[in-house]
Swiss-Prot record:
It comes from the Eukaryota. Residues 20-85 form the Kazal-like domain. Pfam families: Kazal_1. This is Serine protease inhibitor Kazal-type 7. It is found in: Secreted. The record marks 47-48 as: Reactive bond. The gene is Spink7.
Length: 85
């Protein structure tokens, strides 16, 4: 129970302290190759809030979560830019 509480506190602190907005970089990409060794339903994404925008115009919590959707959609969803959509 203490572990869960600690993780929730860490997530909340990360969310609140994410004060800098990331600018978009048109040439930036996301490399999902490291996640291909896991089943799509079991990709171990970290609990950090560094938002990225997918080509479906959904803001994902971080690049790992976007990669999960990219792999789930067989590449139909792509990385658009860093930051919120």
């Amino acid at each position: 129970m203490k572990l869960v509480g600690g993780l929730l506190l860490l997530f909340a602190a990360t969310y609140v302290c994410n004060c800098s907005e990331v600018t978009s970089h048109p040439s930036a990409t996301v490399d999902c190759d490291i996640y291909k060794k896991y089943p799509v339903v079991a990709i171990p994404c970290p609990i950090v809030n560094i938002p990225v925008c997918g080509s479906d115009y959904i803001t994902y919590g971080n690049k790992c979560k976007l990669c999960t959707e990219i792999l789930r959609s067989n590449g139909k969803i792509q990385f658009l830019h860093e930051g919120h959509c």
